[in-house]
UniProtKB/Swiss-Prot annotation:
GO terms for molecular function: ATP binding; proton-transporting ATP synthase activity, rotational mechanism; proton-transporting ATPase activity, rotational mechanism. F(1)F(0) ATP synthase produces ATP from ADP in the presence of a proton or sodium gradient. F-type ATPases consist of two structural domains, F(1) containing the extramembraneous catalytic core and F(0) containing the membrane proton channel, linked together by a central stalk and a peripheral stalk. During catalysis, ATP synthesis in the catalytic domain of F(1) is coupled via a rotary mechanism of the central stalk subunits to proton translocation. The lineage of its organism: Eukaryota, Rhodophyta, Bangiophyceae, Bangiales, Bangiaceae. It is found in: Plastid, Chloroplast thylakoid membrane. It comes from the Eukaryota. Belongs to the ATPase B chain family. One of its GO terms (cellular component) is chloroplast thylakoid membrane. F-type ATPases have 2 components, F(1) - the catalytic core - and F(0) - the membrane proton channel. F(1) has five subunits: alpha(3), beta(3), gamma(1), delta(1), epsilon(1). F(0) has four main subunits: a(1), b(1), b'(1) and c(10-14). The alpha and beta chains form an alternating ring which encloses part of the gamma chain. F(1) is attached to F(0) by a central stalk formed by the gamma and epsilon chains, while a peripheral stalk is formed by the delta, b and b' chains. Its main location: plastid. PANTHER family: ATP SYNTHASE SUBUNIT B', CHLOROPLASTIC. This is ATP synthase subunit b', chloroplastic. Keywords: ATP synthesis, ATP-binding, CF(0), Chloroplast, Hydrogen ion transport, Ion transport, Membrane, Nucleotide-binding, Plastid, Thylakoid, Transmembrane, Transmembrane helix, Transport. In plastids the F-type ATPase is also known as CF(1)CF(0). It comes from Porphyra purpurea (Red seaweed). InterPro entries: ATP_synth_b, ATP_synth_b/b'su_bac/chlpt, ATP_synthase_B_chain.
Length: 158
């Protein structure tokens, strides 16, 4: 029976949670473990994660600025290209207009030369016609005089 109160006392002392020297030792071990984990593991990991976040942030910023620059350059090149096309079309139109005016001028000159040649040919033909008519008139006069003399001489012979 004497033994029973000791057993009851041990049961009461050895319960689920005792407030003796092991509790502060466990708390101290826990704090030392947390301190070691913080210095050995968490700080380098958070530093690496922070560096990675910073790298991603700067890379995204750089990429977005490069994308904006690329868009600006593309817009500028499109504008320059459309301006060059307009200039080229204007030059082509001006060249076509100049060529058309040169062709029209050449056609007018050719027509004027042709008209001049036709006029000169017509004048020459009229002159030749006049000369031919004059020659024919002279020949007709001569022939009629000859016929007349022959007729008169043949009548005088009869």
């Amino acid at each position: 029976m004497i033994y029973l109160p000791l057993l009851l006392a041990e049961e009461i002392e050895g319960g689920l949670f005792d407030f003796n020297g092991t509790l502060p030792l466990m708390a101290l071990q826990f704090l030392i473990l947390m301190l070691l984990l913080n210095t050995i593991f968490y700080k380098p990991v958070t530093k690496i994660l922070d560096e990675r976040d910073e790298y991603i942030r700067t890379t995204l910023t750089t990429a977005s600025s490069m994308l904006v620059k690329a868009d600006e350059l593309a817009a500028k090149y499109e504008e320059d290209l459309s301006k060059a096309r307009r200039d080229a079309q204007a030059k082509i139109a001006a060249s076509q207009k100049d060529a058309q005016s040169i062709v029209s001028e050449d056609i007018k000159k050719a027509q004027m030369n042709a008209e001049k040649l036709i006029t000169e040919a017509s004048k020459q033909l009229n002159i030749q016609k006049e000369e031919a008519l004059k020659t024919l008139e002279d020949q007709v006069d001569t022939l009629s005089d000859q016929i007349k003399t022959k007729l008169l001489s043949s009548q005088s012979l009869k």
